[in-house]
UniProtKB/Swiss-Prot annotation:
Its EC number is 2.5.1.7. It comes from the Bacteria. UDP-N-acetyl-alpha-D-glucosamine binds at R93, R122, P123, V124, D125, Q126, D305, I327. Belongs to the EPSP synthase family. MurA subfamily. Its main location: cytoplasm. The modification 2-(S-cysteinyl)pyruvic acid O-phosphothioketal is found at C117. Pathway: Cell wall biogenesis; peptidoglycan biosynthesis. This is UDP-N-acetylglucosamine 1-carboxyvinyltransferase. Cell wall formation. Adds enolpyruvyl to UDP-N-acetylglucosamine.
């Protein structure tokens, strides 16, 4: 199993390009199931979750062709097996995103209940409830969601909670439904908007993406299109935090601050200077960061996927910060590992109180989920001596070539097998 070795104490500087967003790419790849025409995607990140999704789509009969460095052409003309088996799904919860498109196009789907991250329960009941409202017959048996419908009917759906994958699944299904579907309490995330833009380029009729009410007028069929995946805002935020923690000066290319307002604001509160360009962001960090408190909540509030990284920078900041997690239970698994490096953190329910210390010291730590592992990398970059991070397959699920990108910015980091 791969490990990451980090020699701490190097200041990050220079330029590096960001990748396409995993959380936009996964649903957008599933959108190819809605048409028999080829769909061309660019700026697709090279990540384990993407490879898993492409294997899953291939198993269903979708033609997968690589095109250049970051391009993929998917052809759903040969779609003949609307099944997502446990073997394919167990490592990645996003595989539930095939459910809506399959029912809409094939009239049937069997999708194993998903695996993926270890950060608490993520029920698919909102997806099921929405499909039932659209006339699908849905059963959950032997660990599979089995859905059937001759043709889905437009419906008014109000989800019990804000769910990103639920919104995406139902929006895709509604594209081929008969009549109008209205999704209320819809997720407003930029990745939902990117998916909607892709679907519209394929001939879908969607309005309101990016607000909490999305309207979809069903059409008889969708066609091929070309779509560039949006930049990864969480990867961007993670590198900004890494530079901030090390007192660095970096410029991130092929990205946008448009969806990062809360993250940028918090980094400025911590004392960083940030310059936003059209397709780039520059951060200049102070000698020592100031502690910043935060509360996670659905977009456009502070993203839960940046919580662990901000905990890491607060570990060595001046002052005391309170971090309140309101999205997922069980999302403080990085705390014990950060404490092995010398952090001073106290958990009280869904709050973490972080008291900044003067220095962290390298140790062996274990990654427990994708964003937790990113926080350990940031802490390792500032810790004195060597930090060894075990189980970095979690990192590979969401960060493309992280050791190469960090090394380009001057970090002493290498992967060992």
């Amino acid at each position: 199993m791969d490990k990451l070795l980090i020699e701490g104490g190097k200041v990050l500087s220079g330029e590096v390009a960001m990748s396409g967003a995993k959380n936009a790419a996964l649903p957008i790849l599933c959108a190819s199931l809605l048409t028999s025409d080829p769909v061309h995607f660019t700026n697709v990140p090279h990540l384990n979750d993407i490879s898993t999704m492409l294997r899953l789509l291939g198993d269903m009969g979708v033609g997968v062709t690589m095109d250049g460095i970051d391009g993929i052409v998917l052809n759903g003309g040969g779609l003949n097996n609307p099944v997502a088996s446990y073997e394919m799904v167990k490592t990645m919860r996003a595989s539930i995103l095939v459910l809506g498109p399959l029912v809409a196009r094939c009239g049937e789907a069997r999708v194993s209940l998903p695996g993926g991250c270890a950060i608490g329960a993520r029920p698919v009941d909102q997806h099921i409830k929405g499909l039932q409202a659209m006339g699908a017959e849905v059963k959950v048996e032997q660990g599979y969601v089995h859905a059937k419908a001759t043709r889905l009917k437009g419906a008014r759906i109000c989800t019990d909670m804000v769910t990103v994958t639920g919104t995406e699944n139902l929006m895709m299904a509604a594209c081929l439904a008969e009549g109008e579907t209205v999704i209320e309490n819809a997720a407003r995330e930029p990745e939902v908007v990117d998916l909607a833009n892709c679907l519209v380029s394929m001939g879908a009729r969607i309005s309101g993406a990016g607000t909490d009410v999305i309207r979809i007028q069903g059409v008889d069929k969708l066609h091929g299109a070309t779509h560039a995946i949006m930049p990864d805002r969480i990867e961007t935020g993670t590198y900004l935090c890494a530079a901030a923690a090390t007192g660095g000066d970096i410029r991130l290319l092929k990205t946008s601050a448009a969806y990062l307002d809360t993250v940028v604001d918090k980094l400025m509160d911590a004392g960083c200077e940030i310059t936003v360009e059209r397709d780039a962001i520059r951060l200049v960090a102070p000698k020592r960061l100031k502690a910043v408190s935060l509360r996670t909540a659905p977009y456009p509030a502070f993203p839960t996927d940046m919580q662990a990284q901000f905990m890491a920078i607060n570990c060595i900041a001046d002052g005391v910060a309170t971090i309140r997690e309101t999205i997922f239970e069980n999302r403080f698994m990085h705390v014990n590992e950060l404490m092995r490096l010398g952090a001073n953190i106290q958990i009280e329910g869904n709050n973490a109180i972080v008291r900044g210390v003067d220095r962290l010291e390298g140790a062996t730590v274990m990654a427990t989920d994708l964003r937790a592992s990113a926080s350990l990398v940031i802490a390792g970059l500032v810790a004195q001596g060597e930090t060894v991070i075990d189980r970095i397959y979690h990192l590979d699920r969401g960060y493309e070539r992280i050791e190469e990108k960090l090394a380009k910015l001057g970090a002493a980091v290498r992967r060992v097998h």
